[in-house]
C-alpha cells in the first residue's frame, strides 16, 4: 500500500510539472533571428538635391525590431531604425561607397550591403549649356598639386590622372547626355617659357580628350555619304579662326591652307575677339536657342575672359568667380528657353595619385607584323651620295610613328582617334620602353585642318597619341607648325626642317604624324640622296603599330627601315576607352 501511494504522488508531480498546473514551470517558444535581408535597390545612384524613391527592406525569419547602418549614409539620407526604409534628399555629392545595414531582434541579426552613389545635379537638356573646363598652365595651377611640369609646360602624371578622372564627372554634369560640341585652346597661341625652351600649351586638349572618347558620334562612312557608323569618339575643335593672322617668328606658324569655320578653337590672346565670335556668332546657338552641351577647355586666362565677355555681351550680369579656384572646378552658363541665364559651379573634388595611370595589360604582338623593308637593301652597292647642295645632318635618328586607332571603317574620320586608340596612347610609355629613347618629340600642330571622311576636322590625333608618352617621360612636346601639312611642298619642307641645318645632328627624334605622309617624305629624302629606283612602300591603312626609322650616320649616309614596332595588337583592343 505504501509503495502504491508513493507511486501515485510521483505520477501526480510529473503531470503537474509538464502541464504547468499549480504554478510550476511553463513551456517557452524561442523567437527566430531575422535572415536573408535585402533591399528593393541594392545599387543606387542618386542626384544631389533630388528626393529619392524610398528604398525598403525585406527579410525572412523572425520579426525585426531594429535597424542600423554603418558607415553613416550620405548627407541628407536617413535610415528608419524601426522600418529600415532609406529615404531623404541627398545634400552632397558622394563617391560610390558600400553601406552595411543590420536588421536585429533579441536573438540575432542579419545584414545586407548597399552601394550608393550621389552624383551632381545635371544641367538641363532643354537649356543652352556653355560648359567651361579650366586646364592648368604655368601661370595658373595649384603648385601643391603638381599637375604641370615646370620644365616641359606639359601635364605631369598627376595631371594626366586628373584628366582621366575628370571625364566621368563631366559626364555626370551633362546628365550622361552626349556632348554637342567640344572646343579647346589652339596650342600654338600659348607658348610657355621654361628653362629649356618655349613650348605649346597642350594641357587643354589633353584635359578634355578622355571625355571626348566617352562620347559618341555617328558619321557617314560609305562612298554615298549616307551610311552612318557610330564610334566611341568626338571631334575636338582647335583650329584657327578665319580671321587668324599668324604671328611673326618666333613662333612661326604657317598660314593655314585650309580653313574650317566649324573647327575653330580658342585663341589664348583672343585675337580679333575670335573667342566671343565663336560662341555668339559662329555657333549661332544663343540667338537661335539651340539646346545642347557645348564644352570649352582652356586655361584660366582665356576662360575667365570669355566668361566675362559672354556675360556682358549677352546682358546676363552673372556673378562670376573673381579668381582662379583650381583644376577641379567646372563652370557652366546655363541659358533657359526664356533667355535667362545662370552660372552653375561644380567641384569634382578629385585627388588623383601622382603616379602614371595603372592600366590593364594590353594585347601584345609576338613579332612585328609589317612586311620588312630596308633602304639601301642589305648587301647592295654603296648608297649614292647626297645631291649637290643637300647637306644632311649627322648622327641623327628619327622614328616615324603613326597616330593611334582612328578609323572603325576605312572612310570614317573625325580628326580624333577612337576609344580603342586610347589604350594604345596610354600604353605607349610601356610599349616603347627599351625600344627607343628620343631626346626630342615632335608632332603636327593640332590646329591644322585635315579633309577626311566627308568633312573637315582639326587634326588632333597625332599629337594626342604621343602626349601620354611625353608626360610619362617628362619630355616637352614640340609642334611642327611652320609647314602646312597638306601643301604640295610639305614633304620637301619637312625634310629640310628635320634633316638639314644641323639642328637635329646628334639627336634622336620621335615624330608622331600622319601615315600617308611618311612615304612621300622618305621618297623626297631618297631623291636628295640621288636614289633613282628605290622608293618607300605604302603604309597600310590598318597598320597602327609599325615604326619607321630614318638614320643619318656620322658622315650623313642614309638608311631607312621598318624593323621596329610598338608591339600592340590593334585587332584585340577594346572598342571603348579604358576607365579608371
Where is each model-derived feature located?
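Short, solvent-exposed loop/linker segments at beta-strand-coil boundaries, enriched for Pro/Gly
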Residues: 63-66, 70-79
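A short beta-strand segment in extracellular, disulfide-stabilized domains
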Residues: 49-59
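Extracellular and select intracellular beta-sandwich modules with Ser/Thr-enriched
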Residues: 108-114
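Bacterial Sec-dependent N-terminal signal peptides
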Residues: 9, 15-38, 115-123
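Exposed beta-strand face motif in extracellular beta-rich ectodomains
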Residues: 95-99, 507
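Strand-loop-strand motifs at the edges of beta-sheets in extracellular beta-sandwich domains
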Residues: 75-91
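Active-site-proximal alpha-helix that buttresses catalytic centers in soluble enzyme cores
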Residues: 124-284, 303, 308-502, 518-580
Amino acid at each position: 500500500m505504501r509503495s502504491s501511494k508513493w507511486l501515485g504522488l510521483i505520477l501526480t508531480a510529473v503531470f503537474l510539472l509538464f502541464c504547468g498546473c499549480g504554478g510550476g514551470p511553463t513551456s517557452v517558444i524561442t523567437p527566430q533571428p531575422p535572415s536573408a535581408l535585402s533591399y528593393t535597390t541594392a545599387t543606387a545612384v542618386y542626384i544631389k538635391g533630388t528626393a529619392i524613391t524610398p528604398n525598403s527592406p525585406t527579410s525572412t525569419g523572425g520579426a525585426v525590431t531594429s535597424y542600423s547602418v554603418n558607415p553613416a549614409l550620405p548627407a541628407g539620407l536617413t535610415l528608419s531604425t524601426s522600418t529600415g526604409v532609406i529615404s531623404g534628399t541627398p545634400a552632397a555629392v558622394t563617391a560610390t561607397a558600400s553601406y552595411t545595414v543590420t536588421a536585429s531582434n533579441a536573438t540575432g541579426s542579419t545584414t545586407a550591403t548597399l552601394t550608393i552613389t550621389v552624383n551632381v545635379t545635371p544641367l538641363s537638356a532643354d537649356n543652352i549649356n556653355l560648359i567651361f573646363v579650366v586646364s592648368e598652365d604655368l601661370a595658373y595651377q595649384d603648385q601643391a598639386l603638381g599637375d604641370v611640369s615646370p620644365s616641359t609646360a606639359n601635364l605631369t602624371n598627376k595631371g594626366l590622372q586628373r584628366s582621366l578622372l575628370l571625364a566621368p564627372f563631366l559626364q555626370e554634369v551633362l546628365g550622361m547626355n552626349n556632348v554637342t560640341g567640344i572646343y579647346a585652346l589652339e596650342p600654338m597661341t600659348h607658348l610657355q617659357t621654361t628653362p629649356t625652351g618655349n613650348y605649346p600649351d597642350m594641357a587643354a586638349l589633353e584635359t578634355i580628350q578622355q571625355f571626348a572618347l566617352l562620347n559618341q558620334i555617328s558619321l557617314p562612312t560609305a562612298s554615298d555619304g549616307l551610311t552612318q557608323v557610330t564610334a566611341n569618339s568626338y571631334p575636338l575643335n582647335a583650329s584657327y579662326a578665319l580671321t587668324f593672322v599668324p604671328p611673326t617668328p618666333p613662333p612661326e606658324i604657317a598660314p593655314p591652307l585650309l580653313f574650317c569655320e566649324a573647327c575653330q578653337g580658342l585663341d589664348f590672346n583672343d585675337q580679333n575677339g575670335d573667342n566671343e565670335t565663336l560662341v555668339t556668332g559662329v555657333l549661332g546657338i544663343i540667338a537661335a536657342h539651340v539646346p545642347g552641351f557645348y564644352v570649352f577647355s582652356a586655361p584660366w586666362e582665356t576662360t575667365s575672359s570669355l566668361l566675362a565677355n559672354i556675360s556682358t555681351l549677352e546682358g546676363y550680369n552673372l556673378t562670376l568667380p573673381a579668381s582662379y579656384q583650381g583644376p577641379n572646378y567646372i563652370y557652366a552658363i546655363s541659358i533657359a528657353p526664356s533667355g535667362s541665364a545662370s552660372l552653375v559651379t561644380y567641384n569634382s573634388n578629385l585627388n588623383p595619385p601622382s603616379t602614371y595611370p595603372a592600366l590593364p595589360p594590353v594585347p601584345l604582338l609576338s613579332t612585328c607584323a609589317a612586311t620588312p623593308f630596308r633602304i639601301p637593301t642589305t648587301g647592295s652597292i654603296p648608297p649614292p651620295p647626297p645631291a649637290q647642295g643637300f647637306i644632311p645632318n649627322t648622327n641623327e635618328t628619327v622614328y616615324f610613328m603613326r597616330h593611334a586607332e582612328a578609323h572603325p571603317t576605312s572612310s570614317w574620320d573625325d580628326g580624333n582617334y577612337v576609344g580603342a586608340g586610347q589604350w594604345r596612347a596610354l600604353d605607349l610609355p610601356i610599349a616603347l620602353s627599351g625600344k627607343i629613347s628620343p631626346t626630342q618629340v615632335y608632332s603636327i600642330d593640332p590646329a591644322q585642318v585635315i579633309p577626311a571622311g566627308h568633312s573637315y576636322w582639326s587634326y588632333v590625333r597625332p599629337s594626342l597619341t604621343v602626349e601620354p608618352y611625353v608626360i610619362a617621360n617628362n619630355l616637352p612636346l614640340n609642334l611642327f607648325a611652320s609647314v602646312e601639312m597638306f601643301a604640295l611642298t610639305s614633304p620637301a619642307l619637312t625634310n629640310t626642317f628635320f634633316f638639314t641645318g644641323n639642328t637635329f645632328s646628334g639627336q634622336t627624334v620621335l615624330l608622331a604624324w600622319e601615315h600617308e605622309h611618311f612615304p612621300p617624305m622618305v621618297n623626297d629624302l631618297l631623291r636628295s640622296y640621288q636614289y633613282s629606283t628605290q622608293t618607300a612602300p605604302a603604309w597600310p591603312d590598318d597598320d597602327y603599330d609599325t615604326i619607321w626609322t630614318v638614320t643619318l650616320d656620322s658622315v650623313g649616309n642614309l638608311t631607312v627601315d621598318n624593323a621596329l614596332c610598338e608591339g600592340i595588337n590593334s585587332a584585340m583592343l577594346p572598342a571603348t576607352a579604358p576607365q579608371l
